[in-house]
């Protein structure tokens, strides 16, 4: 999982990427290709 300060560019890397808020943190998740996972902060 990558840790980035900005997730906007990571969201556009794959068409199945979704932005999710969990416990005040922002994550990018991808069910079909898990190597695109990322976390902000």
UniProtKB/Swiss-Prot annotation:
Biological process, per Gene Ontology: translation
GO molecular function, one term: structural constituent of ribosome
Any Gene Ontology CC annotation: ribonucleoprotein complex
Record key words, sorted: Ribonucleoprotein, Ribosomal protein
InterPro entries: Ribosomal_bL36, Ribosomal_bL36_sp, Ribosomal_L36_bact
PANTHER family xref list: 50S RIBOSOMAL PROTEIN L36 2, LARGE RIBOSOMAL SUBUNIT PROTEIN BL36B
Family: Belongs to the bacterial ribosomal protein bL36 family.
Name assigned to this protein: Large ribosomal subunit protein bL36
Gene: rpmJ
